[in-house]
Amino acid sequence: DAKAANAWLDKIDNPQRALEVQTRRATLLARQGKLREARMLVQQVPERGPEDARAKLLAESQVLREVKRWGDAHSILVAASERFPGDADLLYEQAMMAEKLLRIDEMERVLRRVIELKPDHHHAYNALGYSLADRNLRLSEAQELIEKALQLAPDDPFIIDSMGWVLYRTGKNRQALE
């Protein structure tokens, strides 16, 4: 219930958490169909510096993703990536929204850029490898990417699942089940 959730949020009196609180409020509003109001709530949080500006853009895109407004979220993330060039995490989020919009070439290009900027970004290796395997393309490359992700985060269940998928796609059914 949105009213009860807002009552709990009212109890948080910490300026350091203002964006987090407003993002949660905005998500509640967006789920009620009040998207314009939700976005304004996030946009009106005061910025103390560039990191706050970046966080606000991520928060607004998160609210949009919650209500499956992939195109709007993607637009914000593209603008954020232009404003904060070289930010691997923003680029990763942009790639994930490109994938939702079926802009696979963009997703692949941006994920490769993420890996270039941040060679230990296991999510980027996994997303790219899984995407290739899911489309049954360049399976040896897909497996290499997922193996790299697994080296970086050996206990990540999503990466373990991706490895099973690529092994299945390459006909290694017994290994896939392990």
Q: Model regions: which residues?
A:
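Alpha-solenoid helical repeat scaffolds
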Residues: 1-178
